[in-house]
Amino acid sequence: MTACEDRTFKLALLVSSRSPTMCAMARPRKPLLSTDRIVETARVLVDAEGLAAVSTRRLAAELGVSGPSLYNHFRTKDEILEAVADSVSAQVDLSMFEDGRDWRTALHDWALSYRAALRDHPNIVPVLARGPGRRPAGLRLADAVYGAMVAADWPPAQATSIGALMRYFVMGSALGSFAGGFVDDASAYDPADYPHLGQAHLLAEQQEKIDERAFETGLTALLDGLALQYEQVRRAS
């Protein structure tokens, strides 16, 4: 092979190694970083360890990437937590506002779905409690509740109040467990000091049952009260 032919051969090899076809054959060892992957990893961290566990350094380590690569998707830690919060809002069923259920039944069923989502991810509730802000799923949730109440002939101002009331009630129930707040040590409840708490040490083992029953009791009372107001609105119109 002449010197000219040798240079031509090497140039051909160099060009082919940089061609789209050759590059397409290469595969990254790990999945490409994505917004969804970051949010899912952050949600797992929040669920397991709380809001304080989330940092760009920790997320980068969990994802096996460099810290700066996260900034291609989120500018701050707060943006990541907002996205995690919205991913939880997206788990709430809204179909009851679209399938013909009356306003009371729809609110009841929606409240159960909403509480279930928050119960599965209680550590993110403080972020959700800030309000929907610009979060798409949170705004869809607010829009669905308000729209359904107005469609049922609630005045707009009262429809707004109902949305706020339901949010306060559901979020409040998700912030902690009443029954879980008692210890299973009978000696902690000396009858001399707490004459009516002789069985309080038994509450913790019935935590889920007691909390579910309390939520249903409160929800029924709340909806009963709204139903009375609704009749007054109908008579006045």
Regions found by a protein language model. Give the residues of each.
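Short hydrophobic/aromatic patch on the recognition helix
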Residues: G64-F74
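Basic, helix-initiating cap at the start of DNA-binding domains
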Residues: M1-R58, E62, R75-E82, R213
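Alpha-helical structural segments
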Residues: D36-V44, A48-E49, E79-S95, T105-S113, ...
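Hydrophobic alpha-helical connector segments
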Residues: L94-A137, P156, M166
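Hydrophobic alpha-helical bundle segments that form small-molecule/ligand-binding pockets
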Residues: L141-P191, A204, E208, L226-Q229
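C-terminal peripheral helix-coil segments that are non-catalytic and often amphipathic
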Residues: T2-C23, A179-S237
